[in-house]
């Protein structure tokens, strides 16, 4: 059982150093959205017991951070083209949707009225869950959409405007695609990287272990809901600060998969017999 933080504080630390480059800021923002959505999912799966104020505070922070990224992008001398304009509009849509999510979370009522409690009325928990689900739906596609916008914007920026640090060597197309899927919030791991998933597809985890050894990605234990009903939480794989820098220098390269591709860039692993943990 976890104690709810102060109503003015978000669910987790969102005050990371602000990068001077728009691409890095967008990559970091996508990571915050993925983390926020995971926290709501855990609540919906009965794996968290924080009050709605903390979730609303996180959503408010994300809304402000998104508008901040939009301002940073608009300050760049980008060509006035349809792809760039669409990328900015996409970011504005995310900010507006997050504002709606904030309202749902802010109006959620966590306390069961005494009268209803005495009568055994199950409604309050159900109504609270509905508010959480509606808020979750509004931010569901935020992280992938931000990565799409970051990719488009990176294509139109000079190379030295992608990152505030020197390029990380060795980011080939396969590793870059893995980092993109991590940035989208699509990658989970189980049993210390022995098994990894891009969304619901089992994949070989060797590349992920290599990236973790190079401090480009990290696992956040028990931070993502299991794909199996009633299963224990999985570890979400997230970009580190070094991983954000590395991807910011490589995100503009052509990718072998599209934004809406159903299959991951990672090679599928051989299908083993299911273990007890996955039943």
Per-region residue spans from a language model:
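Leu/Val/Ala/Ile-rich N-terminal alpha-helices, chiefly Sec-type signal peptides and the beginnings
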Residues: 1-68
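Long, low-complexity, charged/polar intrinsically disordered regions in eukaryotic proteins
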Residues: 124-168
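Hydrophobic alpha-helical membrane segments, chiefly transmembrane helices and signal peptide h-regions
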Residues: 29-39, 96-106, 134-153, 179
